Swiss-Prot record:
Pfam families: Amidohydro_1. InterPro entries: Amidohydro-rel (IPR006680), Deaminase_MtaD/DadD (IPR023512), Metal-dep_hydrolase_composite (IPR011059), Metal_Hydrolase (IPR032466), MTA/SAH_deaminase (IPR050287). Zn(2+) binds at H65, H67, H216, D304. It is an enzyme of class 3 (hydrolase). NCBIfam families: PRK15493.1. This is 5-methylthioadenosine/S-adenosylhomocysteine deaminase. Catalyzes the deamination of 5-methylthioadenosine and S-adenosyl-L-homocysteine into 5-methylthioinosine and S-inosyl-L-homocysteine, respectively. Is also able to deaminate adenosine. It catalyses: S-adenosyl-L-homocysteine + H2O + H(+) = S-inosyl-L-homocysteine + NH4(+); S-methyl-5'-thioadenosine + H2O + H(+) = S-methyl-5'-thioinosine + NH4(+). It comes from Bacillus cereus (strain G9842). Substrate binds at E94, R150, H189, E219, D304. Keywords: Hydrolase, Metal-binding, Zinc. Its EC number is 3.5.4.28, 3.5.4.31.
């Protein structure tokens, strides 16, 4: 099946960050086979031609760190620091989860993400009360591209920890794939919730199965102090000593990193999922993304969970990310719009090991989203496309979402998930949680 999308303004995110006016994209099954400007002559003998009527077309957004199973916890635990938020709000509520509630919560997060333009994401879920196979089936049904990882903790007894490692290894062996729509990573929660033995086992599983690692690291000053007091090393050095960085690793946050650590992480291909809104809301601080990029680190933007954000709007994250860097450095040139867009598209895709997506180029997967600026005053005049995408647009502006060549959202309507049912069930299950 060949489909051509014509009469579009195309934000390619190629090496030149080229914006093509009055262009077209040809998709064959799940791949982009041509991207050009001008009138379409049907040289490829396509099956369908769709007039985009001047819509902006850009790569699907890539969210590098989420917790979609937590989506029912939106608004619970506002105005709290990370540790009390986890210990008195999030973990007690997660302990009440059932398989049915976890699916309803996941569906809500997936619906919010895809309708706001996210096409790919990397997720960590707490396995307590969760049917992991049902979660993977739910993500698959959504049509999204994802790395969904089972989180490991050292809570309970040593036997509990051993069982957690065994279950996580089975999960990795079942779901890890080098390519395709769904995969997984090895995901120890953090250095403050995992023993040294567990982190070493996670490193072993990652090496033996050739997977990536996903971990919360250097998120707060308290974490750095506590790990240094307990192990005599800062979190980065401690994680390295456990062998975690033998495989490409995504660290969520990286708020508290010094110059030497940034250089070390760049050398060891450790990437950062930058969560600006979540870090601000939890009072964790502001990650120095400008310095990370200057050190050669790979960085991708993320939302974290709705419990700490409180939405999954990647446009908002792009805007906050660039404004924060300008503010903390007192440098208006820090993190310009092209860089912010890169960190939410092709750069983010590289961070989570999905190089097949993130830009609109021949050979890439057909993952793209559209915005119709014609009826939106906040996107007018419509000629400054890149600026408007970062500084003015929001997820609510999305018209269409195409993932792997399939129309997942069309004219604002999700084709893969039952929006009315999901919203109804979210409210019903939320009422059952004991706060």
């Amino acid at each position: 099946m060949k489909t051509t999308y014509v009469n579009a303004t195309i934000v390619t995110m190629n090496e030149q960050n080229e914006v093509i006016e009055n262009g077209y994209i040809i998709v064959e099954n799940d791949q982009i086979i041509d991207v050009k400007s001008g009138e379409f002559a049907n040289d490829f003998e396509v099956d369908e031609v769709i007039d985009m009527k001047g819509k902006w077309v850009l790569p699907g957004l890539v969210n590098t760190h989420t917790h979609v199973v937590m989506s029912l916890l939106r608004g619970i635990g506002d105005d709290m620091l990370l540790q009390p938020w986890l210990e008195t709000r999030i973990w007690p509520l997660e302990s009440q989860f059932t398989p049915e509630l976890a699916v309803a919560s996941t569906e809500l997060g997936l619906l919010e993400m895809v309708k706001s333009g996210t096409t790919s994401f990397s997720d960590m879920f707490n396995p307590i009360g969760v049917d992991q196979d049902a979660i993977m089936e739910t993500v698959s049904r959504s049509g999204m591209r994802a790395a969904v990882s089972r989180t490991l903790f050292s809570f309970g007894t040593k036997d509990d920890e051993k069982k957690a490692i065994e279950e996580a290894e089975k999960y990795v062996k079942r779901y890890y794939k080098e390519s395709g729509m769904l995969t997984t990573m090895v995901a120890p929660h953090s250095p403050y919730t995992c023993s040294t033995e567990l982190l070493e086992e996670c490193a072993r599983i990652a090496v033996e199965n050739q997977t990536m690692v996903h971990i919360h690291l250097s998120e707060t000053e308290r974490e750095v102090r506590d790990i240094e007091a307990q192990y005599g090393k800062r979190p980065v050095e401690y994680a390295a000593s456990c062998g975690l960085f033998k495989r490409p690793t995504v660290i969520a946050h990286g708020v508290v990193l010094n110059e030497n650590e940034r250089a070390f992480l760049a050398e060891h291909d450790v990437r950062v999922a930058h969560n600006p809104n979540s870090n601000l809301k939890l009072g964790s601080g502001i990650a120095n993304v400008k310095a990370m990029l200057e050190a050669g680190m790979k960085v991708g933007i993320a939302t974290d969970s709705v419990a700490s954000n409180n939405n999954l709007d990647m446009f908002e994250e792009m805007r906050i990310a660039t404004l924060l860097q300008k503010g903390i450095h007192q440098d208006a040139t820090a993190l310009p719009v092209e860089t912010a867009l890169t960190l939410a598209t092709k750069g983010a895709a590289e961070v989570i090991g999905m190089k097949q997506t993130g830009s609109l180029e021949v050979g890439k997967c057909a993952d793209f989203i559209t915005i119709d600026p014609s009826n939106k005053p906040h996107l007018q005049p419509a000629d400054e496309v890149l600026s408007h995408l970062v500084y003015a647009a929001s997820g609510k502006d999305i018209s269409d979402v195409i993932i792997n060549g399939k129309r997942v959202v069309w004219n604002g309507e999700c084709k893969t998930l039952d929006e009315e049912r999901i919203i109804f069930e979210a409210s019903r299950y939320k009422r059952g949680l004991q706060r």
